[in-house]
């Protein structure tokens, strides 16, 4: 009984810290050459742009059209994933959710790239037993969703994207049906609190990425061509439980 009580107290404490969010509208930036400082910046719990990472050679349009493994991913009933990507453009909205995005990532090679480059820079020895990365591949515009993982890394593969971010404290100003929407497309017909809806646009080019802390709102769009984007969700047991319990995933 005492053990259960102690575990219960620990769970409550961890949940409390998970729910704490910094709502400052500022971002940090760092060059990949300074990656030894990544962990210290992540402790600030504000968005962090990482520049000039080693390029990702997977999940580009060329990669999807050339590797046969993508043709067999069961995303659509009537057409293949390859056909959809080949006909999509910068205005196409990504039609799949996290479960399908994870299936695509599993064959893309994202985990190999992340294990070689990203994980060693941010997952310390003691965090290996606590953080569990989950990988997702997206194609097309992705509307608003709320970050749940302790950290979510967003990175474009082969073209520039614009990521819109909003802190948790703007939630009361959002439309009732904010999910999958885009901040720059909301009007006074969607919400009477449009002037309170503050967001920041961050331009990411291939080789750059954005770490987003939990409890922020994010969306992204491409320019000129369909955006091919990868995300890596660094989950703690608490955030993973919240992810599976969320009605938005």
What are these regions (language model features)?
Residues 1-209, 217-249:
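N-terminal accessory scaffold of Fe(II)-dependent oxygenases
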């Amino acid at each position: 009984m005492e053990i259960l009580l102690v575990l219960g107290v620990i769970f409550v404490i961890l949940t409390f810290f998970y729910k704490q969010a910094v709502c400052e509208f500022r971002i940090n930036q760092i060059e990949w050459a300074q990656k030894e400082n990544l962990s210290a910046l992540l402790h600030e719990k504000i968005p962090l742009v990482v520049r000039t990472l080693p390029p990702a050679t997977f999940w580009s349009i060329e990669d999807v059209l050339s590797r046969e493994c993508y043709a067999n991913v069961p995303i659509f009933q009537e057409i293949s994933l390859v056909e959809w990507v080949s006909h999509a453009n910068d205005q196409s909205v990504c039609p799949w959710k996290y479960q399908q995005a994870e299936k695509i990532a599993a064959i893309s090679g994202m985990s190999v790239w992340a294990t070689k480059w990203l994980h060693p820079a941010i997952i310390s020895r003691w965090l290996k037993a606590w953080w569990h990365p989950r990988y997702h591949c997206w194609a097309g515009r992705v509307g608003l969703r709320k970050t749940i993982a302790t950290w979510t890394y967003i990175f474009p593969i082969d073209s520039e994207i614009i990521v819109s971010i909003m802190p948790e404290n703007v939630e009361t100003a959002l439309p009732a049906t904010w999910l999958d929407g885009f901040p720059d497309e909301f009007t006074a017909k969607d919400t009477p609190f449009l002037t309170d809806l503050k967001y920041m646009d961050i331009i990411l080019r291939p080789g750059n990425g954005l770490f987003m802390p939990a409890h922020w709102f994010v969306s992204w769009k491409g320019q000129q061509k369909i955006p091919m984007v990868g995300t890596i969700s660094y989950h703690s047991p608490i955030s993973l439980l919240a992810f599976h319990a969320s009605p938005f995933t």
